C-alpha cells in the first residue's frame, strides 16, 4: 500500500529497481496522477492498482458515490491484505507536496494552521496531539479514514527534516504507525519535543498540587 506524496513515490522507485519480479502497489488515496508520472521508467516493474480519481473531489456527494464504484471497492479490499503500508508525513508549510501540486492553496494552509494543524497523514490534517482537524476538506477527501489506518498491516511512516518535527510528533502521539523511518537529527529533535511536552505537563501538575 502507498499513500500520497513525494516520499512514497521515491520508495516506489527504490522497490521497483531492486525487485526481481513485479511488485503489487496499491494506492490508498486518490490523486496518484500528481506524482506517478514523475517516477522513473523502472516503475513498470510494479503492478499498479490505482484509485482513478483526484485526491480532493469537488463535493462530498461525488466522493461518496465514487466509493461505491466496484473498481474502487476492489482496491480498498486489496489494501486490507497488503503486507506493508508506506505513508508520508506532511508538514504544514508551502513546500508540502499537496500545496506544490496546487491541490490546496496557500490560503487553505493558513486556515489549517489557524485551526491548529501541524501536519498530515494520508492527507488528513492533525493537531499536535494527533487529533483530526475536521474541515470541509475531510468531506471531499478520497482517503481512508484515520480510524481505519489500524486495519492495515505494518504501517511504515517515512519522513525527515526540521519542517516535519511537529508533524512526526503528532503522528506518533496519535499512534498511527507501526514503524517510523527517519534520520538521526530528526529523531533527536522529536525526542526533545517529547521531553519538552512532558516537562511542561509535569510542572503544571506540580503547580496544581501546590
Go through the PLM ranges and name each one.
Residues 1-17:
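Helix-turn-helix/homeodomain-like alpha-helical modules used for DNA recognition
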Residues 3, 26, 30-33:
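Flexible loop/hinge segments that line or gate small-molecule binding clefts
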Residues 4-7, 23, 182:
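N-terminal phosphate-binding or glycine-rich loops at protein starts, especially the Walker A/P-loop
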Residues 16-25:
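A short alpha->loop->secondary-structure connector
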Amino acid at each position: 500500500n502507498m499513500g500520497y506524496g513525494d516520499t512514497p513515490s521515491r520508495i516506489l522507485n527504490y522497490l521497483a529497481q531492486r525487485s526481481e519480479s513485479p511488485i503489487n502497489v496499491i494506492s490508498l488515496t486518490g490523486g496518484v496522477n500528481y506524482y506517478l508520472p514523475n517516477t522513473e521508467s523502472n516503475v513498470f516493474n510494479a503492478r499498479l492498482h490505482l484509485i482513478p480519481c483526484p485526491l480532493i473531489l469537488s463535493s462530498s456527494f461525488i466522493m461518496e458515490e465514487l466509493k461505491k464504484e466496484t473498481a474502487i471497492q476492489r482496491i480498498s479490499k486489496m489494501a486490507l491484505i497488503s503486507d506493508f503500508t508506506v505513508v508520508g508525513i506532511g508538514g504544514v508549510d508551502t513546500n508540502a507536496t499537496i500545496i506544490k501540486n496546487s491541490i490546496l492553496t496557500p490560503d487553505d494552509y493558513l486556515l489549517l494552521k489557524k485551526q491548529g494543524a501541524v501536519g498530515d497523514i494520508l492527507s488528513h490534517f492533525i493537531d499536535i496531539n494527533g487529533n483530526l482537524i475536521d474541515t470541509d476538506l475531510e468531506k471531499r477527501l478520497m482517503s481512508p479514514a484515520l480510524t481505519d489506518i489500524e486495519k492495515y498491516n505494518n504501517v511504515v511512516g517515512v519522513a525527515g527534516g526540521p519542517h516535519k518535527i511537529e508533524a512526526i510528533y503528532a503522528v506518533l502521539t496519535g499512534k498511527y504507525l507501526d514503524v517510523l523511518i527517519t534520520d538521526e537529527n530528526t529523531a533527536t529533535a522529536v525526542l526533545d519535543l517529547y521531553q519538552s511536552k512532558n516537562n511542561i505537563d509535569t510542572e503544571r501538575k506540580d503547580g496544581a498540587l501546590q
